[in-house]
């Protein structure tokens, strides 16, 4: 980055170098101070020129995405394998690719389903972060994890998407538990719910289920459902055989909902790129 500074009663011209771009770089500044223009935009351009894969969070879509797209068109020769340019944009699905953040092929154990449930529920309920371990915090996470894992093992994961999980959760709990507990690997996982059901503690059970339903109901949206049920690309963005430049768009007016969903994508991307 070009720099100009005053020292010794003289103006000097120089460069600011990110010596190790693979380590974290923090850019601090007040709104409107020029963080994107002076630093972030240069990062985007230079990383594309060096042939890197990229995960770009565009808070005000499509400010940064347009820069990345146009610069990529002019520097495709920097890549050994031509990268895919992918977009996740919930505001305008016509300008978005589709991607399933809980794709069954990337889940090998029920703990993977739990991590997905944990991420989305805590992103939707920020106050739960300080209450981890509480009964009415852990219960909805476990229930959602069980539903995700059921969708993973049912018919080879054909319906394993987050919208399907939300829709199944909204059905009658008598039907949900009858289906889930018919699978041995979920029977013990859901034993606290079954004990409450068989013990006649209906109020407690409905409270547990409502703790999962109410926050997730905020995500019921045709746009979110459409984007999250497709498989246009996978989240292993730094795969040498299939590199990607992924731009995810947010909207300041809807950030409470979109940020929770994007947090799910983020957790899976982080896990996959570090393998």
Which stretches of residues belong to each language-model region?
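Charged, amphipathic alpha-helical linker segments immediately N-terminal to NTP-binding catalytic cores
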Residues: 1-5
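P-loop NTPase motor domains
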Residues: 9, 16-275
């Amino acid at each position: 980055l070009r720099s100009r500074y005053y020292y010794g009663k003289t103006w000097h011209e120089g460069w600011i170098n990110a010596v190790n771009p693979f380590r974290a770089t923090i850019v601090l500044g007040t709104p409107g101070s020029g963080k994107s223009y002076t630093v972030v935009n240069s990062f985007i351009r230079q990383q594309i020129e060096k042939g890197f894969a990229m995960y770009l969070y565009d808070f005000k879509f499509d400010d940064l995405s347009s820069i990345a797209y146009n610069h990529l068109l002019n520097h495709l020769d920097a890549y050994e394998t031509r990268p895919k340019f992918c977009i996740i944009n919930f505001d305008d699905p016509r300008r978005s690719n589709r991607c399933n953040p809980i794709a069954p092929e990337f889940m090998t154990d029920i703990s993977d389903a739990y991590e997905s449930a944990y991420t989305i529920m805590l992103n939707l309920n920020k106050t739960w972060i300080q209450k981890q371990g509480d009964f009415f915090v852990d219960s909805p996470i476990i229930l959602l994890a069980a539903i995700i894992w059921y969708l993973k093992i049912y018919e080879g994961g054909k319906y394993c998407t987050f919208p399907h999980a939300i829709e199944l959760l909204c059905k009658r709990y008598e039907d949900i538990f009858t289906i889930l507990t018919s699978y041995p690997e979920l029977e013990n996982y859901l034993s606290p719910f079954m004990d409450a059901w068989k013990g006649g503690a209906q109020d407690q059970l409905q409270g547990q289920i409502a703790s999962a339903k109410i926050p997730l109901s905020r995500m019921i949206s045709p746009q979110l459902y459409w984007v999250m049920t497709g498989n246009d690309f996978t989240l292993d963005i730094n795969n040498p055989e299939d590199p990607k430049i992924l731009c995810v768009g947010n909207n300041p007016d809807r950030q409470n909902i979109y940020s929770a969903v994007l947090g799910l994508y983020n957790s899976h991307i982080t896990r996959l790129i570090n393998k």
